[in-house]
Design a protein with these regions (language model features):
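Concave beta-strand-loop units of leucine-rich repeat
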Residues: 1-10, 14, 20-32, 42-54, ...
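Acidic, Mg2+-coordinating catalytic modules of nucleic-acid enzymes
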Residues: 37
Length: 268
């Protein structure tokens, strides 16, 4: 049932009669209250983006819940939301979260979006080994050790954090889309064997040596703006590269790239 973007709909109490409802989207509405959720204990998918929802304890009757979107809300009582065992997808971006301990037992998570919060510690995710998509961009994360067991991970965004050590990524060979924009990264060596990466964003770091990227033969898009790169020779054999940004680097010579098929598209 999709009743999103219906701002004049305030009373949802009638939904209590639909106890077998499997999917509900009330995003971008402003319900007077959310107590009706307690009766919808067969819900598998629930979207409440920007609704004013706060009290996560109201979801504890939803034992079948697999997909949850509570983005753009100021959540509270996170510690009282314990029915998370079946969750596969959680969107909680722009929620001003400072911790995510409520996800401790969410071991079936495949999709997690925590973009733009205030999170420093993501160690609680160490058992989410089936994760395919993870966005923790725009937080305050330094330690990504917990990611090393996420062998299924394909897409990750760590942009705008304080990550320096990429070692936990070195065996995540399914990665194809990696966003590391605006961190404090110096060493790219952990990426050198992640051969299926096709999109890589590394702008605004402290990178000097591109040698580890020379083996990423499937790279199609690479952005390296605002680093400390002087030598781009390691990129010369990346034959599939279609987009390359090298602005704001002290590069001495780009002539080695002139033989590349898409050279005319590149900006340096």
């Amino acid at each position: 049932l999709n009743v999103s973007n219906c701002p004049y709909l305030k009373d949802y109490s009638v939904l209590k009669e639909f106890s077998n409802l499997k999917s509900l989207n009330i995003s971008y509405n402003e319900p007077e209250h959310f107590t009706f959720l307690k009766e919808l204990n067969h819900l598998e998918s629930l979207s409440m983006e920007q609704t004013g929802f706060k009290d996560m304890s109201l979801l504890n009757n939803l034992g079948d819940l697999k997909e949850l979107n509570v983005s753009k809300n100021r959540l509270k009582n996170l510690e009282k939301f314990v029915n998370v065992e079946h969750l596969e997808s959680v969107d909680a971006k722009f929620c001003q979260l400072t911790e995510i301990n409520f996800l401790k037992n969410a071991r079936q998570l495949k999709h997690l979006n925590l973009f733009t919060n205030r999170i420093k510690d993501i160690r609680i995710l160490k058992d989410a080994k089936d994760m395919v998509y993870l966005n923790v961009g725009r937080n305050d994360i330094k330690d990504i050790t917990c990611l090393k067991e996420m062998k299924q991970l394909e897409i990750i965004s760590l942009e705008n954090n304080n990550v320096k050590d990429l070692t936990p990524l070195k065996e995540l060979t399914n990665l194809c889309d990696v966003d590391l924009y605006n961190n404090v990264i110096e060493d790219l060596t952990p990426l050198e064997h992640l051969e299926f990466i096709s999109y890589l964003r590394l702008d605004h770091n402290a990178i000097t040596d591109l040698t580890p990227l020379s083996k990423l033969k499937y790279l199609r898009s690479l952005t390296l703006k605002a680093n400390y790169i002087t030598d781009v020779t390691p990129l010369k054999d990346l034959e599939l590269l279609e987009a390359l940004r090298l602005d704001d680097n002290p590069i001495q010579d780009t002539s080695v790239l002139e033989s590349m098929e898409f050279y005319e598209k590149f900006t340096n």
